[in-house]
């Protein structure tokens, strides 16, 4: 059988286990949870409901796994856990896709016959800076974009999902999407083993009358609280059509939204360029920037010499003149930046002017260090993005630095464009932002690192930009201005507002990418009338901050992201005229958009099962017996706000509403909301605002925790269907099994940085899990056969039990902190490792493992691994015959960790590692010293130091005092060296002092203050003696002697170099041996003669140990005893008695001593008597009764 087939067989076996366990959970309704009356603590965990235009992929699963693992752990903590899971259908993409399918059938027939010579759409280049620092408050406009691959037509996209033409036809009805994908997603999630209460699942939009009613109630409340206003908002707009251009109206640019810039006004100073000299109004070159916080570092501005610019009148009174491209001028005219909406009034004769005619213009740049800067040429500027005017900040923009460097280095280039040296040479990059690892001139540093010599090195410059912009925007700290010391991300919006208030800048918005309407018009961004949530209102911001203050965010980056978003968040359009969703109650021409109906829906989960159980579209009345039209605004207010019952406004019996309110009051608030980090800048912050608005005084309903995670990479590459590096949840389970996939998701990562799902890790997980199951089955067989030891008193046993306690406690802390990668590390990888070590220790002393400890390990391993790998854990739990389900079991109880025992365990482990290294060195001496091959040693001496030598104790005292004086930290080596130099007693140890200090500092980093103790905290000799058999077997030694460094006659060098907890082992020359035959005379026993080398002075126990090592037939469990012949001369020649094989023998005690004389006669001394042995003794090997 091939390796691949063997691996698939393991996966198939795991999948069989998973299927049977899922059926068990289903039959027991394991994850259905209802409000309790007994005071049992609860835990509500939720995940942003996925959008229903496709199957779930591994990225969804990664974020959802954080909720899933938390749910599993909290169940073990004895809480009633609810993990509900809904499905989002609100918004434009589903409707747009359905309409596309309709058009494709109209245009190309059914099934569509698409033209073969279709020219592929040209992909627009996406700048690194655009992706890194664009407005994070905007939601993802199309959730299908990332999943379409290279398909051009919607029909082809649907084909790529494995659908046939007949099936695809159904998707031209947008409602079909709502009924097709949710059941598939539920099936996939059930195969994953998700601990969801599926009774509470629902879909959004007005298709679901209950949820529709809930959203209308929410928006009526928000409007009554004056949180919703009507006014002009930035929208993609078609001037030709005279209306907003939504996705379904676009020939290209689906999913593209508005991108906001700060329009920096660089005033043209005298003397003006000849072409502009006749203009009396103030003239401004207007540059669109995404980073207003960098304006302190302006050294010039750039124009493209060959681009055609336009000079036009700006502002309502036309007292200012702007210079920009005609394209951007057209956009500005729809944003209130010209006198008449939609019309550009050009300066006569300057409708077009080449950039070269404006070069050299003197400018006043807002916030710049230089009073006067100049317009210089840059050849990489494009006229289809921004305004064609680029403000230059060479300290933090690699492009700007490269272009400025070209001009400085190339005089002919300056002369070509009529630039004087004074316009270029005096201007140096200005340090304005400090970035860790890049310094305060980040662009200069990156250009130096990448050896960028010219503005034409596009690839290198793109790499440099990505590094500088990413670190600069998120980690940069301002060095100048009134916001010095603050993070750049925190001051971006504030500086934009300051510049606007002072008339030095204004807001400018254009499409993120080119958008063409179906009428053939290039769209702009225009200010259009819309309903919007006024997140910029000061009072509402303050309330949102109060919600955020006690919130658990699990890491500081998430808190900072939420704080920053709350600070700069402004008005957000909550209405759309196209798509699916709930209609605005007071203006039904509009729909509530997708990021606005999904802010407090977690409250709806608490009652969904009573209203619509069994039908996620709400088409069937649920157990509460309440019809959708009975859930009036007043009814919802009774349930969620506790308003007094009023039968006039609440057309439903109060008892029914009470049942709903009971569920809400028990489950709310959310204990943890987990999501991808991309939702920090929108959904997660909107959640804070809306909870503050709906429950303004009831803080008990505010969310308790928000956890964000990074994106998921697949084999260290971005997931992308177009490149084939993509995997759905269904595919992952099929390839790796559910638990194999789950383990790999846990191992992928926890923070806001991108995590990595690695196929090799998933394959290894399958093998680990399969091997673990087989080992557990083997242990059950050994237990049933009585092959495991009954006691648990040996050193290895005590250490194993102690290490289990330690790792169980550490794993609990990791789960509590939602650090699931660490929980997997301590609760599986390290937990398995201590089992392996224990198994090795037991084998090293020829003893079986302890039955009680082995099964303590198995049970606790299943418990602490169950949140991550619940199927296998449940399977083993049932295999062990445990009561109930493991998903309902309590977290294992542990005894306090015995720190001294832990130190002793490390002492043995580290000592043995050092001893093995010594043996290797002993057996492979350096070639120069090699005169003959060393003899394999059989004896050794271990030297143990109870405390450090006096000079080292003096240094330790110095270090301990310094640690106390410096809040537990040690000073640098220079300071320590000065302190040591002052000690008279240490002067003769000057050369040894600092190496010793360095060793102690390294230990200090690992162990803390305990590394500074001057004596051993444990009895090293006792621990070594208890493990002497293990040490001898590991090193293949016959005899080991333990000596203390304070004994007389110890070599001075050994005394000097041996320190507490680091014993020294020296091998001693081998003593003469003589061979003694040990013969087994037991009847019907497969034991044979064993030739044993005897050393003068060997005890019986030593000889037995040698025999065990020599003969594998003498099993660890056998009890071995030695017997001498009564007649040493004739004993081994006599017939053996069948009835009593040992009638001619006398048993030796363990303390008896073997000797041999000069004539090689072997004898044994027992007490005061001495007996000749001849060359043969007898041994008995019995399996002890349990």
UniProtKB/Swiss-Prot annotation:
Keyword Transcription among record annotations: no
Motif ('HIGH' region): 50-60
Disruption phenotype: RNAi-mediated knockdown results in an increase in the expression of gpdh-1 independent of hypertonic stress.
Motif placement: 'KMSKS' region: 718-722
InterPro entries xrefs: aa-tRNA-synth_I_CS, aa-tRNA-synth_Ia, LARS1_ULD, Leu-tRNA-synth_Ia_arc/euk, M/V/L/I-tRNA-synth_anticd-bd, Methionyl/Leucyl_tRNA_Synth, RBD_LARS1, Rossmann-like_a/b/a_fold
An example Gene Ontology biological process: translation
Keyword list, A-Z: Aminoacyl-tRNA synthetase, ATP-binding, Ligase, Nucleotide-binding, Protein biosynthesis
Entry keyword Protein biosynthesis: yes
Pfam family, one: Anticodon_1
Gene Ontology MF term list: aminoacyl-tRNA deacylase activity; ATP binding; leucine-tRNA ligase activity
EC number from the UniProt entry: 6.1.1.4
Transmembrane spans: none
Domain of life according to the entry: Eukaryota
Family classification: Belongs to the class-I aminoacyl-tRNA synthetase family.
Described function: Involved in protein synthesis. Catalyzes the specific attachment of an amino acid to its cognate tRNA in a 2 step reaction: the amino acid (AA) is first activated by ATP to form AA-AMP and then transferred to the acceptor end of the tRNA.
Protein name: Leucine--tRNA ligase
Species the sequence originates in: Caenorhabditis elegans
């Amino acid at each position: 059988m091939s390796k691949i087939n063997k691996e698939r067989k393991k996966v198939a076996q795991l999948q069989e286990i998973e299927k049977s366990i899922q059926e068990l959970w289903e039959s027991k309704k394991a994850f259905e949870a209802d409000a309790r009356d007994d005071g049992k603590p609860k835990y509500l965990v939720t995940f942003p409901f996925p959008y229903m235009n496709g199957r779930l992929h591994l990225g969804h699963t990664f974020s959802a796994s954080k909720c899933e693992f938390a749910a599993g752990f909290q169940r073990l903590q004895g809480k009633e856990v609810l993990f509900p899971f809904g499905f989002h259908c609100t918004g434009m993409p589903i409707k747009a896709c359905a309409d596309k399918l309709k058009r494709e059938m109209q245009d190309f027939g059914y099934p569509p016959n698409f033209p073969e010579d279709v020219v592929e759409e040209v992909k627009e280049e996406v700048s690194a800076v655009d992706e890194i620092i664009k407005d994070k408050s905007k939601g993802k406009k199309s959730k299908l974009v990332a999943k379409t691959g290279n398909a051009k037509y919607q029909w082809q996209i649907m084909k790529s999902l494995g659908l046939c033409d007949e099936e695809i036809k159904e998707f031209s009805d947008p409602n079909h999407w709502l009924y097709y994908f949710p059941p598939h997603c539920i099936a996939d999630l059930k195969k994953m083993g998700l601990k969801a209460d599926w009774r509470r699942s629902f879909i959004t939009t007005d298709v679901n009358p209950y949820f529709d009613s809930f959203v209308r109630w929410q928006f009526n409340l928000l409007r009554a609280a004056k949180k919703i206003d009507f006014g002009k908002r930035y929208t993609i707009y078609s001037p030709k059509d005279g209306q907003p251009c939504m996705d379904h109206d676009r020939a290209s640019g689906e999913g593209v939204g508005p991108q906001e810039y700060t329009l920096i006004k660089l005033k043209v100073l005298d003397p003006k360029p000849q072409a502009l000299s006749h203009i009396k109004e103030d003239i401004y070159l207007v540059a669109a920037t995404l980073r207003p916080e960098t304006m302190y570092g302006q050294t010039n501005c750039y124009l493209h010499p060959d681009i055609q610019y336009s000079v036009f009148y700006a502002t309502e009174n036309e007292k200012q003149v702007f210079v920009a491209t005609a394209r951007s001028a057209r956009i500005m005219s729809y944003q209130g930046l010209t006198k008449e909406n939609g019309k550009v009034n050009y300066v006569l004769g300057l409708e077009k002017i080449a950039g070269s005619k404006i070069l050299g213009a003197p400018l006043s740049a807002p916030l710049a260090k230089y009073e006067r800067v100049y317009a210089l040429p840059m050849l990489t500027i494009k006229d289809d993005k921004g305004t064609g005017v680029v403000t230059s900040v060479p300290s933090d923009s690699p492009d700007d630095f490269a272009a400025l460097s070209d001009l400085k280095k190339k005089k002919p280039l300056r002369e070509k464009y009529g630039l004087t040296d004074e316009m270029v040479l005096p201007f140096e990059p200005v340090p304005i932002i400090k970035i860790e690892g890049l310094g305060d001139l980040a662009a200069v540093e990156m250009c130096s690192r990448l050896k960028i010599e010219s503005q034409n090195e596009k690839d290198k410059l793109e790499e440099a930009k990505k590094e500088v912009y990413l670190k600069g925007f998120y980690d940069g700290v301002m060095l100048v201005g009134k916001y010095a010391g603050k993070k750049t991300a925190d001051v971006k919006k504030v500086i934009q507002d300051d510049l606007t208030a002072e008339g030095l800048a204004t807001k400018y918005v254009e499409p993120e990418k080119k958008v063409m309407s179906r009428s053939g018009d290039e769209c702009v961004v225009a200010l259009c009338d819309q309903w919007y949530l006024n997140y910029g209102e000061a009072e509402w911001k303050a309330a949102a901050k109060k919600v955020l203050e006690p919130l658990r965010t699990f890491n500081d980056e998430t808190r900072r992201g939420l704080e920053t978003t709350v600070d700069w968040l402004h008005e957000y359009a909550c209405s759309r005229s196209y798509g699916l969703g709930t209609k605005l109650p007071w203006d039904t021409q509009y729909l509530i958009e997708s990021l606005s109906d999904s802010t407090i829906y977690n409250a709806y989960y608490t009652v969904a099962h009573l209203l619509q159980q069994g039908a996620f579209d709400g088409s069937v009345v649920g157990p509460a017996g309440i019809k959708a039209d009975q859930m009036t605004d007043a009814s919802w207010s009774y349930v969620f706000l506790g308003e007094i019952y009023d039968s006039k406004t609440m057309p439903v019996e109060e008892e029914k509403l009470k049942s709903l309110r009971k569920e809400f009051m028990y489950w709310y608030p959310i204990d943890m909301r987990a999501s991808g980090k991309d939702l920090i800048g929108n959904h997660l912050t909107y959640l804070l605002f809306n909870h503050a608005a709906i429950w303004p005084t009831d803080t008990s309903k505010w969310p308790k925790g928000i956890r964000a995670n990074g994106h998921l990479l697949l084999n260290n590459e971005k997931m992308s269907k177009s490149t084939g590096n993509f995997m759905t949840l269904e595919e992952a389970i099929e390839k790796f099994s559910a638990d194999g996939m789950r383990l790999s998701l846990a191992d992928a990562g926890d923070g806001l940085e991108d995590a990595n799902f690695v196929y090799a890790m998933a394959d290894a997980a399958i093998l680990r899990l399969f091997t673990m199951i087989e080992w557990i089955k083997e242990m059950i067989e050994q237990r049933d056969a009585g092959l495991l030891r009954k006691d648990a008193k040996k050193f290895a046993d005590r250490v194993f039990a102690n290490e289990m306690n330690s790792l169980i406690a550490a794993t609990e802390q990791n789960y509590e902190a939602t650090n699931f990668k660490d929980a997997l590390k301590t609760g599986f990888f390290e937990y398995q490792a201590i089992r392996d070590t224990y198994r090795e220790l037991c084998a090293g002393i020829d003893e079986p493992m302890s039955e009680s400890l082995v099964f303590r390990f198995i049970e606790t391993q299943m418990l602490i691994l169950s949140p991550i790998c619940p199927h296998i854990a449940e399977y083993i739990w049932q295999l062990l015959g445990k009561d109930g389900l493991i998903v309902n079991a309590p977290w294992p109880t542990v005894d306090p960790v015995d720190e001294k025992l832990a130190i002793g365990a490390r002492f043995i482990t580290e000592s043995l590692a050092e001893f093995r290294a010594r043996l290797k060195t002993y057996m492979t001496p350096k070639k120069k010293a090699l005169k003959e091959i060393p003899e394999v040693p059989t004896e050794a001496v271990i030297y143990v130091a109870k405390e450090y030598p006096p000079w080292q104790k003096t240094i330790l005292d110095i270090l301990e005092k310094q640690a106390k004086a410096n809040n537990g930290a040690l000073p640098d080596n220079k300071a320590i060296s000065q302190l040591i130099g002052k000690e008279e007693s240490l002067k003769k140890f000057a050369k040894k002092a600092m190496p010793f200090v360095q060793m102690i500092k390294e230990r200090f980093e690992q162990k803390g203050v305990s590394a500074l103790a001057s004596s051993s905290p444990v009895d090293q000799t006792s621990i070594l003696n208890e493990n002497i058999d293990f040490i001898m077997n590991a090193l293949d030694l016959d005899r080991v002697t333990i000596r203390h460094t304070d004994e007389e006659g110890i070599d001075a060098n050994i005394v000097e170099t041996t320190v507490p907890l680091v014993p020294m082992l020296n091998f001693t020359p081998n003593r003469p041996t003589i061979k003694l035959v040990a013969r087994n005379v037991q009847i019907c026993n497969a034991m044979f003669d064993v030739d044993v080398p005897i050393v003068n002075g060997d005890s019986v126990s030593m000889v037995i140990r040698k025999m065990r090592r020599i003969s594998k037939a003498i099993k660890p469990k056998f009890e071995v005893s030695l017997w001498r012949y009564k007649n040493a001369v004739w004993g081994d020649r006599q017939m053996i008695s069948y009835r009593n094989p040992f009638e001619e023998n006398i048993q030796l005690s363990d303390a008896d001593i073997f000797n041999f004389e000069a004539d090689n006669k072997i004898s044994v001394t027992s007490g005061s008597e001495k007996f000749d042995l001849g060359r043969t003794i007898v041994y008995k090997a019995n399996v002890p009764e349990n």
